[in-house]
């Protein structure tokens, strides 16, 4: 998901200032077990309950565009917001109703709505997704998730299999950290250095990370990703990264029943190609892998027409 070109500071800094605290900048060697049964429920730091469905539609800037009977949900990844889909959206709206929303951590969402305790694991993000679908009275959809949203979609489909006809997982990983018998792409010590760099100087880290993540030589894509990355409040960005890197979904992949399409670029700094093979072998639903002939973690920004062809092909068959 992230790497930094900047070395860690000589003396580690505490996590960035800002409301609620990021929960410290240390990574745990034992991954958090995400609850498949649900319930990020209420209470975070303020003890407030999760917003109602109607209120959530407003908070997360939910939009429904396009026409057609079939519904597609587009869910963006870390460091972006729903605008990341703008280049592929025209390829989908002619034949589908498309639901777009912002994750609560996105810079386009009022940061007062980010409850550090509630969003300390992915279950609360799953709650938000399911609440949106219920509020819109959507009985069935195809879900397209990028990076962390691929994880969210996997968990949501396990909790509510009736809702999800297909999952399209872009730059997906069930676990970003390496293990004794698994190559996720990152060592624990490496991630700790990234957390330290984010906490010490978020601007410097983001400036170095954006071109690495985009990968391909597409300056406009780097500029766009930089914009949304800088829109995130630094302490929220760090907290989200810590949450993602302590998550391990390998044990629940077999519970997925929806057919899946895993979309992988030829070189992704965040997700090795071996992870796509792992997902194909372990997801419970019928799974195919589509390799895009481009580099980078954000093909919807760097190669939108190429990704759109894969999406149209995948979404024509559900």
From Swiss-Prot:
GO terms for molecular function: hydrolase activity. The keyword Nucleus applies. GO terms for cellular component: cytoplasm; nucleus. The active site is at residues 147, 268, 297. Its EC number is 3.1.-.-. It holds the Pfam family Abhydrolase_6. It comes from the Eukaryota. Residues 1-48 are annotated as: Disordered. GO terms for biological process: secondary shoot formation; strigolactone biosynthetic process. Residues 1-11 have a biased composition (Pro residues). Residues 36-47 have a biased composition (Gly residues). It is an enzyme of class 3 (hydrolase). Keywords: Cytoplasm, Hydrolase, Nucleus. Substrate binds at residues 147, 241, 297. Belongs to the AB hydrolase superfamily. Involved in strigolactone (SL) signaling pathway. May function downstream of SL synthesis, as a component of hormone signaling or as an enzyme that participates in the conversion of SL to the bioactive form. Strigolactones are hormones that inhibit tillering and shoot branching through the MAX-dependent pathway, contribute to the regulation of shoot architectural response to phosphate-limiting conditions and function as rhizosphere signal that stimulates hyphal branching of arbuscular mycorrhizal fungi and trigger seed germination of root parasitic weeds. This is Strigolactone esterase D14. It comes from Oryza sativa subsp. japonica (Rice). The gene is D14.
